[in-house]
A protein has these predicted regions:
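Noncatalytic, beta-rich nucleic-acid-contacting surfaces in large DNA/RNA-processing enzymes
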Residues: 1-652
Length: 652
């Protein structure tokens, strides 16, 4: 700790740590869940200040991976906050340090190959269909953009089009010159700079555009310099990220406290619970942070993790590149494959990962233990390996071999170890980052294993706008034996809620906010009217809820998903929709113009709603399709119910 404090002071970063500590302190005081991730997890100072939540000594993390006294660059701590309260943190930062001393960071969008063709074609007044034909011939591969010159070399049809007419040749030649040119300005999703004097004294500023220009954004300025230039100037930068997982966990823990009386937070959710690892080993990971994908689920079922270290390793390995080592890791873990080391001195470093190099920190420890590197030099080595700089690699190869020889390690073995590192460069992953995310993965699994109703309710509420995820998580609820009830005008809130049965067989009730085309305004109007008690019938609903505020479209969608089934059949309610909205509007207009009696009651006769005589069974399949369309799944029934007995006899 004394060593770290000395380095931080020598490098002039005391203020940086205190500002980040202040942000975390405020978040704790206001109940805003946060998590600091990345290489900062290697700092004991950050851990003791409650900036990071992972013990660096327990997990073998290295301070110099985060802050190297020989590499003068600004520290970088990424702060994840629950995404629904991230704006509160930005507001506090602007208020505490001054509106004129904080700014977000600009980004520049450049013109891609297709966009260049389309923009140039528009200026040249070439027919849109022709321009579109040219643009679509350039392959659009996510993560592997192809430039116009590459397309001319590799795509025969594009080359043929280029040679076909003079105007296509001019279009493509001009677009080639425009490709890569800055097209628009945006705002970095997370980066915020904080200065001691007005920001304008350090860096030119810009008015934000897009979502960053919204009135509710507490930070009103953006730098004119992008991230790399901000770093080069040495300005203090903090990344404010929003993480929905923290929102889910916080909401679930609030429900647990409300229903069970237990108070959980990130500091006391266990990571050593056997039932949690059993859940992970069964692959029941829908809604569990970082591990819910089908590939990850398959490997977890093979692994049967027993400890947090197992999960941390899987988080690091489950990426393109290292994924090829997962089968070997699992076999070694279960004793089905021999654990081997290039040299016996590697065992203390690689034992936790069964002889396989998984983390960047393992390269650093190996260089320190086998070749006498200092932690700072080991960090330079790690960086050189990661960036594949030939001159740096050659220099370090010679240095490593020389140091290894002094420890009686043969040159050929030292060369083999270094060769392994060069291959490792394809997938090296910082253990600090994997540990942060591994802890959250295990903690979310714990909440799901022990408090499934509360956890799934929070999960569904956060993802209620994503019908695909809602369908997935509702199916998982049903697998766990948790009943998910349809939206109901008298029982649902905006979010999903928990309903306890007579014997505490808790169920989850769909939130009205999960219904498509039903926004906050309509739901607020309904909930405000319902504050005096449930609606007794359709007349009571129309005369207590101002359906002008609800809106005809939202009301129609609520009827279609069955939220008003207590008041009549869906077809009948839909036919009476105009009558329903008209009577409600007349009633509330009368209230507004003061047609009230002396004692505050409406004068005259309350107009009754007459529902048409229609069988409730009419259009059953169509009603289920409405549910599928508006909330993403069948909730009141299933189209296969009539043939379920037959299916049970014939399908296994």
């Amino acid at each position: 700790l004394k060593y770290e404090l000395g380095i931080i002071n020598e490098m002039g970063f005391d203020t940086y740590f205190l500002i980040v500590w202040d942000l975390c302190r405020y978040a704790r005081e206001k109940g805003i869940w946060y998590n600091a991730r990345g290489s900062a997890a290697g700092s004991i100072v950050a851990y003791t200040l409650d900036i990071t939540l992972v013990d660096p000594i327990e997990h073998g993390l290295i301070f110099e991976r985060f802050l190297n006294p020989g590499r003068v660059s600004m520290p970088d701590i990424d702060l994840d906050f629950r995404d629904d309260l991230r704006s509160h943190m930005l507001e506090y930062t602007a208020r505490k340090y001054g509106d004129d001393k904080v700014a977000q960071i600009i980004t520049f969008g450049t013109m891609g190959a297709r966009a260049a063709v389309r923009d140039v074609g528009r200026v040249m007044d070439i027919p849109l269909s022709e321009v579109d034909r040219a643009a679509k011939l350039i392959p659009n591969i996510p993560g592997k953009p192809m430039s116009i010159p590459e397309a001319l070399e590799q795509v025969a049809d594009f080359k043929q089009l280029y040679n076909s007419t003079s105007y296509f040749k001019e279009l493509i030649d001009t677009a080639t010159k425009m490709e890569g040119v800055t097209r628009n300005a945006g705002t970095h999703a997370a980066g915020v700079i904080i200065t001691d004097k007005p920001t304008i004294e350090y860096i030119p500023l810009h008015r934000p555009t897009g979502s960053a220009a919204a009135e509710d954004n507490p930070i009103k300025t953006v730098t004119q310099f992008e991230m790399s230039n901000v770093d080069a100037l040495g300005l203090l930068k903090v990344d404010f990220l929003g993480l929905s997982t923290l929102t889910i966990m916080a909401r679930a823990c609030d429900l647990i406290h409300e229903r069970q009386g237990e108070r959980y937070h990130l500091g006391n959710i266990p990571t050593d619970d056997p039932a949690t690892y059993e859940l992970l080993g069964r692959g029941e990971t829908a809604g569990v942070f970082q591990v819910e994908g089908s590939g990850m689920r398959r490997y977890l079922m093979q692994m049967k993790p027993k400890t947090l270290d197992n999960v941390i390793a899987m988080v690091a390995l489950f990426r393109p590149g290292p994924m090829e080592f997962i089968p070997s890791y699992i076999k070694r873990m279960h004793g089905d494959e021999e654990i081997t080391y290039r040299h016996e001195m590697l065992e203390p470093v690689l034992k936790e990962t069964y002889g396989i190099t998984v983390y960047q920190e393992q390269i650093m420890y190996t260089a320190m233990n086998l070749a006498g590197y200092s932690a700072s030099d080991a960090d330079y080595l790690r960086k050189g390996v990661a960036k594949k700089k030939a001159d740096v690699l050659l220099e370090h190869r010679q240095k490593f071999i020389t140091g290894a020889k002094e420890n009686n390690i043969p040159e050929d073995i030292a060369n083999q170890i270094f060769d392994d590192w060069e291959a490792f460069a394809r997938y090296g992953f910082p253990k600090g980052h994997a540990a942060d995310y591994g802890v959250l993965a295990v903690q979310t699994a714990y909440l799901k294993a022990h408090f499934p109703v509360e956890y799934m309710t929070a999960l569904l509420s956060v993802y209620q706008d994503d019908t695909d995820k809602v369908a997935l998580y509702v199916a998982d609820c049903r697998r766990m034996g948790i009943d998910v009830k349809p939206p109901n005008i008298n029982a649902s809130g905006w979010d999903f809620t928990i309903e306890d049965g007579p014997e505490r067989a808790a169920a989850i009730r769909f939130g009205l906010g999960a219904v498509k085309n039903v926004g906050h305004g309509p739901v607020d109007a309904i909930l405000t009217a319902r504050a005096d008690g449930p609606f007794s019938d359709i007349d009571d609903f129309a005369h207590r809820a101002d359906l002008r505020q609800v809106g005809k479209r939202a009301l129609e969608c609520l009827i279609r998903v069955g939220a008003l089934d207590n008041f009549g059949s869906r077809p009948a309610l839909l036919q009476a929709l105009d009558q329903l909205t008209s009577i409600s509007a007349s009633h509330f207009r009368a209230l507004e113009i003061g047609q009230m009696s002396l004692f505050g009651k409406q004068s005259g006769v309350i107009e009754k709603i007459t529902l048409p005589e229609i069988s409730a069974e009419v259009g059953r399949r169509e009603q289920l399709n409405w549910e599928r369309e508006l909330i993403g799944l069948y909730v009141s029934d299933h189209p296969l119910t009539p043939v379920l007995d037959l299916l049970n006899q014939t399908v296994t």
